[in-house]
Amino acid sequence: KGVARRDLLAMLQAKRPWVDAKLRQQQQRMAVRPRYQYQTGERLPYLDTELTLHVMQGTRGACIREADTLHVYWSPRSRKTVPEQTAQAVAQWYRAEALRLLEAKTQRLCDSVGLTCHGVNVRATRSKWGHCTFDGRIQYNWQIVLAPTPVVDYLVAHEVSHLRHHNHSRAFWQHVHAICPDYQRLRVWLRDEGHRLILPPYER
C-alpha cells in the first residue's frame, strides 16, 4: 500500500504542471467570456452577423427580430428588472431560433445522405455542443447559433454522422469529412473559441 501511495503521489506531482496550465487556461477563458448589460444599442452575435438590441416598454415581455435589430419589450408588471427581463426574452428568442434552424439543417442533411433523425431538441449544456442518442435523436446546445454558420454546419455534420457511427472511429471521421470537408479547421475553431459562445444571464 505504501509503495502504491508513493507511486500515486509521484504521478500527481508529475502531472501538476499540466494541471496548473489547464487551470490558468480556464481562468483566461473565463476572463474573456462575454458579459452583456442587455441595453439598447448593445450588439449580440448571431451566425454571420450581429443583432442590435432595441429595448422598450410593452404590455408583456417579447422579442421580435426586424432585419438586424432585436426589439425587446419589457413589462412594468414584472418583478424582474428591465435588464433581467431583456436577458430572458433574448435567450428565449435565441433558443427558439436555434431549434428552428437546427431542425431544418439536420433534416436537410439527413435527406441528402440517406439517414433518418427521429427528433431534434436544444438545451443549454455545459460540456457538449451536441449529442446523438442510440435511438436516433439529436440534441444541440442552442448557443451554437452564436458561432459563424460554417461552425454550425460542422456541428450538424458531426451529429448526423453519429446516426450511422455511434463512436469516433476512423469511419466516423471519414463520414464527417465526406459531408464537411473543412471539418478539421472548424472543429479546432469550436474547441478554441467555444467558451465565448454564451449568452449569460444579466449580472448587476
Residue ranges and their predicted role:
Residues 159:
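Walker B catalytic acidic pair
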